[in-house]
Amino acid sequence: MAKRDYYEVLGVSRTASADELKKAYRTKAKELHPDRNADNPQAEAQFKEVNEAYDVLRDADKKAAYDRYGHAAFEGGMGGGARAGGGYGQQGDFASAFSDVFEDLFGDFMGGRGGAPRSRAQRGSDLRYNLRVTLDEAYRGVQKTINVPASVACDACKGTGAEGGAEAVTCPTCSGMGKVRAQQGFFTVERTCPTCNGMGQIVKNPCKVCHGAGRVEKERSLSVNIPAGVETGTRIRLAGEGEAGMRGGPSGDLYIFIEVREHALFQRDGVHLFCRVPVSITAAALGGEVEVPTIDGGSSRVKIPAGSQTGKQMRLRGKGMPALRGGGAGDMLIELAVETPVNLTARQKELLREFEKLSEDNNPEGKSFFSKVKGFWDGMTG
């Protein structure tokens, strides 16, 4: 079943502001929340659809990608945009992205459900890095060194957030639950613990370097292997090279998105290459050979049939791009562009006029065209 338009899901126009999007989301989420629609089996699916729509439209980069490509922008790859000013971005988890909206909507009403103490360790966020390579590098494969700014585990406290690497202790306010309960009229509501900010544990003596966070900002230098055959949109995952986890949690992953630059000679279509080659009017008329460059740095001689016209294509098999996952290489298509002479001398012009008189029967396309024109005019006057 095809996905619905995200703007339609939220009931807003494509020009809706961030505040209008948030207001529409709050209304829809409150209306469709499963806890309030126990008798409606469709509510949960609709609620997830609303969350998905808001997740995309609330983020400027994701929204721009969706406005341009629709749902196809997120098929086969992860969403998320780059941070402003660089080729690097961060993806937080779903719960943190929507916690402000849900808390305002429902007041975290979870009373009576019980629960277990929260783990203080949290996985780090995934990162995105946009990397540009040349077509030649994409053909051969290349090793690239990139500098990635990211949060890394604090060396001073070994990522614990505590001075000297000491262990955190259970929060005395929430007893490690990360939530506190309060009675409001007939309802028991749960809210994030103000003492530990929902972590369930506190650090008595915070590390002086990271101030209790367990991680610090640092630029890392990483070596990345770019395989032969990559194209724009290829995604490379480096496990564990994302943001460091919070207080001893595992690191996220780094996703590298490839962009292949345009080439001065070749245009690319998947594994195939296209090259437009100029030939003289003499070579096109009489036939001959032309030397064309190939992406591997060499060249190939190609025979031009007599009477070739602009646009005629010839194929060099196996001279295209290598397939990313093996299976050989594509082809190179050569398109002829017959050049019209310019800056002619008086003698050259004289010879061309003489040639024209002698070649009235040697231009089949021209004769066919003007025959059609005559038939068209005769039909108009008849």
From Swiss-Prot:
Protein name (database record): Chaperone protein DnaJ
Similarity comment: Belongs to the DnaJ family.
Oligomeric and partner information: Homodimer.
Superkingdom classification of source: Bacteria
GO CC list: cytoplasm
Organism: Cereibacter sphaeroides (strain ATCC 17029 / ATH 2.4.9) (Rhodobacter sphaeroides)
NCBIfam families given in the database record: DnaJ_bact, PRK10767.1
Cofactor note: Binds 2 Zn(2+) ions per monomer.
Primary role: Participates actively in the response to hyperosmotic and heat shock by preventing the aggregation of stress-denatured proteins and by disaggregating proteins, also in an autonomous, DnaK-independent fashion. Unfolded proteins bind initially to DnaJ; upon interaction with the DnaJ-bound protein, DnaK hydrolyzes its bound ATP, resulting in the formation of a stable complex. GrpE releases ADP from DnaK; ATP binding to DnaK triggers the release of the substrate protein, thus completing the reaction cycle.
Gene3D superfamilies listed in its UniProt record: DnaJ domain, Heat shock protein DnaJ, cysteine-rich domain, Urease metallochaperone UreE, N-terminal domain
Each CXXCXGXG motif repeat, start to end: 154-161, 171-178, 193-200, 207-214
Gene Ontology molecular function: any one: unfolded protein binding
Statement: the UniProt record of this protein carries the keyword RNA-binding: no
PROSITE patterns: DNAJ_1, DNAJ_2, ZF_CR
SMART domains per UniProt: DnaJ
Positions annotated to bind Zn(2+) 2: C171, C174, C193, C196
Free-text note regarding domains: The J domain is necessary and sufficient to stimulate DnaK ATPase activity. Zinc center 1 plays an important role in the autonomous, DnaK-independent chaperone activity of DnaJ. Zinc center 2 is essential for interaction with DnaK and for DnaJ activity.
Residues in J domain copies: 5-70
Zinc finger (CR-type) in chain: 141-219
Keyword entries, A-Z: Chaperone, Cytoplasm, DNA replication, Metal-binding, Repeat, Stress response, Zinc, Zinc-finger
Compartments, record wording: Cytoplasm
Xref: InterPro entries: DnaJ, DnaJ_C, DnaJ_domain, DnaJ_domain_CS, HSP40/DnaJ_pept-bd, HSP_DnaJ_Cys-rich_dom, HSP_DnaJ_Cys-rich_dom_sf, J_dom_sf
Lineage: Bacteria, Pseudomonadati, Pseudomonadota, Alphaproteobacteria, Rhodobacterales
CDD domains (alphabetical): DnaJ, DnaJ_C, DnaJ_zf
Binding site for Zn(2+) 1: C154, C157, C207, C210
GO biological process: one example: chaperone cofactor-dependent protein refolding
